[in-house]
Amino acid sequence: MIKQRTIAQVVKAIGIGLHKGEKVTITLRPASANTGIVFRRVDLDPVVDFETTPEAVGDTQLCTCLINKDGVRLSTTEHLIAAVAAMGIDNLIVELDSSEVPIMDGSALPFIYLLQKGGIEEQNAAKRFIRIKEKVRIEEGDKWAELEPYDGFHIDFEIAFDHPAINESRQRIGLDITTKSFIEEISRARTFGFMKDIEYMHANNLALGGSMDSAVVLDEFKVLNPNGLRYSDEFVKHKILDCVGDMFMTGHNILGKVTAFKSGHDLNNKLLRKLMATESAWEWATFETPVTMPAPGLELAPA
């Protein structure tokens, strides 16, 4: 049986919040089977929990922001969720002493390291996947995204930015997403932004933690980071990283293929909501014996 997973021990890290620019402590705790991924703001009294559901995503303007029924917010969850999805973890408590997850270096790699430090522990319950049965598609202008049946988990993503530095890199990638491929090919890809936008946001007390330490920064012509890019196609790879996290907002790994053109957090979330609302388009899947199709959670992630 392919079993559910949590981490084996409590782990902590400290980073800077993207929006407030303040120190944030993140604590990951093991959770019992069938708990799901729960975010908890411990800076509030009483503490406030956020479930990982497509409907919990209430704002995607600058990041993925979870908003509960009382309007309490938790921002910048996307890179951590992508790491959790890639490691095939089903049950986890994420405690934060702030209104945002620390941005770290702008990628998912620090969270991969943190989860690996915690270790992976299998639980005595069957892991439940969401298996796509029929195509679901959503469009907005020239942007679109779709999910369709696939024997594993695959993302085919294309971006289109009219910028010299981005034009020099590959703007479309198709990749089977496994724990190994995510760590090696995707996890180090950082979020990216333009210097003029960062300066504007800083002037308006936004993205105060944003810098070249936590993003790829571009001017009108080039990448400004002294060490350049981590991958030659880092821009589209970060969009895939975001998509991995966005597709895990059910708290379950998907067996299917995502194809997207110029999509982002908002459209990805709308696609996931449409999928879950279309009962004929998906089903729950469990596996009594190990399988070898390419997807996170089908093989035990290296601790």
Swiss-Prot record:
GO annotations of cellular component type: membrane
Protein known as: UDP-3-O-acyl-N-acetylglucosamine deacetylase
Keyword vocabulary terms for this entry: Hydrolase, Lipid A biosynthesis, Lipid biosynthesis, Lipid metabolism, Metal-binding, Zinc
Function: Catalyzes the hydrolysis of UDP-3-O-myristoyl-N-acetylglucosamine to form UDP-3-O-myristoylglucosamine and acetate, the committed step in lipid A biosynthesis.
Cofactor: Zn(2+)
Annotated GO biological process: lipid A biosynthetic process
Organism: Pseudoalteromonas translucida (strain TAC 125)
Enzyme class: hydrolase
EC numbers on record: 3.5.1.108
Protein residues bound to Zn(2+): H79, H238, D242
